[in-house]
Swiss-Prot record:
GO CC term, one of those recorded: cytoplasm
Record gene name: ureB
Binding sites annotated in the UniProt record for Ni(2+) 1: H136, H138, K219, D362
Protein's name in the database: Urease subunit beta
Urease domain sequence ranges: 131-569
UniProt subunit comment: Heterohexamer of 3 UreA (alpha) and 3 UreB (beta) subunits.
Length: 569
């Protein structure tokens, strides 16, 4: 058999086992752990290549043949970093491994059969990840949705009704009528969407009604009064309906301190938003809850990574988002109590330790909806530069750290909100919501986004050009965005109760409607690569953070990766 160099092989078929790939301009190095494509039997589409009739394509139509095959993709997922063909059928991932013609090639499984009905997409030299999941969305403006989508986010969870003051401050779609309105509005968009209802009520019936109206969970927010009673009632109802509860705790400690909140939670599972505290929560020590076994702790992206500009920009953001007035002394003091460089500095380190499990945006409400993925990788790179390789790494690579940070915006938010059966990873049986990246632009600018197995967004050149590549090249909506195709390619998530009562038919929804499940039987230990529990303390005078008795902190960066260099044009 003829042999070629690794360099030649990588240029033709992409990197193989043992090859290493740098992610963007970071210091993060991914090493290919395994190659499933079988040397000498690789698929390659094009003139004079192998993906042709009678060769790697079967002549015989069959019920197993794929709708689409992505060839020679480098998959970066919590399940591994490996090379494979990805087969897509009926909008789902049908197979991962060696694709082709099982009549002519070894190692081809039925679920990766290429036939006359199969489209091809060349994945050689590209990285494929699952679509991102942002679980902290203020639905203030619909323009957020395409912005997030272009960044690689394919699922948005949160609440709101537009630029009302309640939505500007809280991720809540309150009440049956507002939920109906937003569920219908969601029909328009290329994005999986789920809505959170108002959890601030010491009345089980009002909470239950919202869940039965289609909410996938409850959000408790201090601007509506995060009292121990509201916390207890929301969790009681959530346990009954198997939905998640997200919380923004009481910054002013009016209804109780962090210990009172934990007592009200009483060991039940809770998704805590911006657990560091700059986005809101018990001052100065809400960060303590991140180490508890029943807490699923999240960060929002304004505070990660910690930079020389982080503290300064937060004051104006906070005043606007929470309807505060700089001329009122008490409002300024409220804002000051939330912005603590010491706890922000600790947040980056807690991410690197796997104590913080999720990253999200806090869109237009102290967060940037299009930067969840970028800032997650900037944080990973900042931590590697400051602290070096993780002790868990094996070999000369950063695979463990890469899986840890990828999980924060893919599989872990999916698990937290009961949608991991459908999305959140590159696994057989899951919806084919996939993001394709050039390694040089990883984490910043996707090449292409596949939604429900169909291309929804791509970098595309001049439509009047003779080929697809002439300038200007920029993101353009593809066919999955249009007509009734968008109904097949996207999902509206609802509660099991609403699903069972036929909410799709009741509201005349045309998109796929699927129920959330297994939200209440999870703990921190279910957070992939981010399941560390610890005893966390905050010095009430200095705000320094201690984990199991040892102070944790990080330095503010004056330069980050994946930044202006990638946004020149």
């Amino acid at each position: 058999m003829k042999k070629i160099s690794r360099k030649e092989y990588a240029s033709m078929y992409g990197p193989t086992t043992g090859d290493k790939v740098r992610l963007g301009d970071t210091d993060l190095i991914a090493e290919v752990e395994h190659d499933y494509t079988i040397y000498g039997e690789e698929l390659k589409f094009g003139g004079g290549k192998t993906l042709r009739e009678g060769m790697s394509q079967s002549n015989n139509p069959s019920k197993e043949e794929l709708d689409l095959i992505i060839t020679n993709a480098l998959i970066v997922d919590y399940t591994g970093i490996y090379k494979a063909d990805i087969g897509i059928k009926d909008g789902k991932i049908a197979g991962i491994g060696k694709g082709g013609n099982k009549d002519m090639q070894d190692g081809v499984k039925n679920n990766l059969s290429v036939g006359p009905a199969t489209e091809a997409l060349a994945g050689e030299g590209l990285i494929v990840t699952a679509g991102g999941i942002d679980t902290h969305i203020h639905f203030i403006s619909p323009q957020q949705i395409p912005t997030a989508f272009a960044s690689g986010v394919t699922t948005m969870i949160g609440g709101g009704t537009g630029p009302a003051d309640g939505t500007n401050a809280t991720t809540i779609t309150p009440g049956r009528r507002n939920l109906k309105f937003m569920l219908r509005a969601a029909e328009e968009y290329s994005m999986n969407i789920g809505f959170l209802a108002k959890g601030n009520a010491s009345n089980d019936a009002s909470l239950a009604d919202q869940i039965e109206a289609g909410a996938i969970g409850l959000k408790i927010h201090e601007d509506w009064g995060t009292t121990p009673s509201a916390i207890n009632h929301a969790l009681d109802v959530a346990d009954k309906y198997d939905v998640q509860v997200a919380i923004h705790t009481d910054t002013l400690n009016e209804a109780g301190c962090v210990e009172d909140t934990m007592a009200a939670i009483a060991g039940r599972t809770m998704h805590t938003y911006h657990t560091e505290g700059a986005g809101g929560g018990h001052a100065p020590d809400i960060i303590k809850v991140a180490g508890e076994h029943n807490i699923l702790p999240a960060s929002t992206n304004p505070t990660i990574p910690f930079t020389v500009n982080t503290e300064a920009e937060h004051m104006d953001m906070l005043m606007v988002c929470h309807h505060l007035d700089k001329s009122i002394k008490e409002d300024v003091q409220f804002a000051d109590s939330r912005i603590r460089p010491q706890t922000i500095a600790a947040e980056d380190t807690l991410h690197d330790m796997g104590i913080f499990s999720i990253t999200s945006s806090d869109s237009q409400a102290m967060g940037r909806v299009g930067e969840v993925i970028t800032r997650t990788w900037q944080t990973a790179d900042k931590n590697k530069k400051e602290f070096g390789r993780l002790k868990e790494e094996k070999g000369d690579n950063d695979n463990f750290r890469i899986k840890r940070y990828l999980s924060k915006y893919t599989i872990n938010p999916a698990i937290a909100h009961g949608i991991s059966e459908y999305v959140g990873s590159v696994e057989v049986g899951k919806v084919a919501d996939l993001v394709l990246w050039s390694p040089a632009f990883f984490g910043v600018k996707p090449n292409m986004i596949i939604k429900g197995g169909f291309i929804a967004l791509s970098q595309m050149g001049d439509a009047n050009a003779s080929i697809p590549t002439p300038q200007p090249v920029y993101y353009r909506e593809m066919f999955a965005h249009h007509g009734k195709a968008k109904y097949d390619a996207n999902i509206t998530f609802v509660s099991q109760a609403a699903y069972d009562k036929g909410i799709k038919e009741e509201l005349g929804l045309e998109r796929q409607v699927l129920p959330v499940k297994n939200c209440r039987n999870i703990t921190k230990k279910d957070m992939q690569f981010n399941d560390t529990t610890a005893h966390i303390e905050v010095n009430s005078e200095t705000y320094h953070v201690f984990v199991d008795g040892k102070e944790v902190t990080s330095k503010p960066a004056n330069k980050v990766s994946l930044a202006q260099l990638f946004s020149i044009f």
